[in-house]
Amino acid sequence: MADDPSAADRNVEIWKIKKLIKSLEAARGNGTSMISLIIPPKDQISRVAKMLADEFGTASNIKSRVNRLSVLGAITSVQQRLKLYNKVPPNGLVVYCGTIVTEEGKEKKVNIDFEPFKPINTSLYLCDNKFHTEALTALLSDDSKFGFIVIDGSGALFGTLQGNTREVLHKFTVDLPKKHGRGGQSALRFARLRMEKRHNYVRKVAETAVQLFISGDKVNVAGLVLAGSADFKTELSQSDMFDQRLQSKVLKLVDISYGGENGFNQAIELSTEVLSNVKFIQEKKLIGRYFDEISQDTGKYCFGVEDTLKALEMGAVEILIVYENLDTMRYVLRCNGSEEEKTLYLTPEQEKDKSHFIDKETGQEHELIESMPLLEWFANSYKKFGATLEIVTDKSQEGSQFVKGFGGIGGILRYRVDFQGMDYQGVDDEFFDLDDY
């Protein structure tokens, strides 16, 4: 989906925030003991600490003893969390503390603090019976940056669009000779001069595009739109002078009636649909590439939990592709009376069979060390295996086929791996039934 690892990492961060928002929104507490605190990047920890001390004094006057104690406890937890930071991190700080009531009716303390993946320019302090996640949701609004090149016979404009913010990066005018009807021996010379000037103009546009849209050898925009009223945009897109890295990012060629800034505005209007579908298109392209590996039988692919984990351990996975709602769980169990641990990967159907959690020889239940959704474990661990993680949906035809046909988990490999010829030592086949995935 993303050509460069930084974009893929960002998508994983977005997935983590979505998951966190979901769990925070579902949480409810008794009274007003759930604190939501957001500190913007340039704020001071000392100011927030003083504000919390004042709040502690105010909360001491709450009449209800139970509510008073839980609010004071939550404020103390926030104060403890803030002590971990000397200053506000570059992207700001988000803290959620409080006592929530679980589905079983039990009370559970929640203490979460993290630096968001991009700056959060909101200041918030609220005590309520729920956590406030509106500012986090705003972070998720897709803010991919798109580049625009508006080119016609009178000049070129280079701009970007990010969210609702458009910016003109550079523009220049050009004086190209017009076609004319002078006859005689000069006609060919004029035509040659005209073509030469036109060629130089396209070259200048191509070179400027590299300066503006490529930084550190990587394209710095999610996609490019070429707009213009004449055939310059087509000429540019097909030209050998136009950098290959930029060429691969062209999303659309747009016909517009004006040049300059008016043309820029018109180009934005005419390309809104394609821009909103970029993630969808990237996903289709990624899964299409995965299917190509399979149809060409390159051996550079894996699917199913078992093979994918083996390939990860070998360091063979270049891109790990996982369905966003993969329901496989990862369990780490300790065999009773020993230090030996074993890891199981079970679907909801397999979880119902309790024999997975019982020692066959002694009949005793294994000690549960850790349990979490496999996708969450991947999101925390994928970098250790040298892979990039792409989390996909089943909204496209390709995505749906990936989920139904391949169990929603697979990978594109760096080199060919013969899974059938591999010896799966130490893996109990009982826990891996590929028919279940």
From Swiss-Prot:
Subunit structure as annotated in this protein's UniProt entry: Component of the eRF1-eRF3-GTP ternary complex, composed of ETF1/ERF1 and eRF3 (GSPT1/ERF3A or GSPT2/ERF3B) and GTP.
Position of sequence motif NIKS motif: 61-64
Source organism phylogeny: Eukaryota, Metazoa, Chordata, Craniata, Vertebrata
Cellular compartment(s): Cytoplasm
Pfam families membership: eRF1_1, eRF1_2, eRF1_3
GO cellular component, one term: cytoplasm
Chief location bin: cytoplasm
GO MF annotation, one: sequence-specific mRNA binding
Family from the record: Belongs to the eukaryotic release factor 1 family.
Gene3D superfamilies tied to this protein: 3.30.1330.30, eRF1 domain 1, eRF1 domain 2
Coiled coil: none
Keyword rRNA processing tagged: no
Sorted UniProt keywords: Cytoplasm, Nonsense-mediated mRNA decay, Protein biosynthesis
Function: Component of the eRF1-eRF3-GTP ternary complex, a ternary complex that mediates translation termination in response to the termination codons. The eRF1-eRF3-GTP complex binds to a stop codon in the ribosomal A-site. ETF1/ERF1 is responsible for stop codon recognition and inducing hydrolysis of peptidyl-tRNA. Following GTP hydrolysis, eRF3 (GSPT1/ERF3A or GSPT2/ERF3B) dissociates, permitting ETF1/eRF1 to accommodate fully in the A-site, followed by hydrolysis of peptidyl-tRNA.
Protein name, as recorded: Eukaryotic peptide chain release factor subunit 1
Organism from which the protein derives: Xenopus laevis
GO biological process: cytoplasmic translational termination; nuclear-transcribed mRNA catabolic process, nonsense-mediated decay; regulation of translational termination
Encoding gene per record: etf1
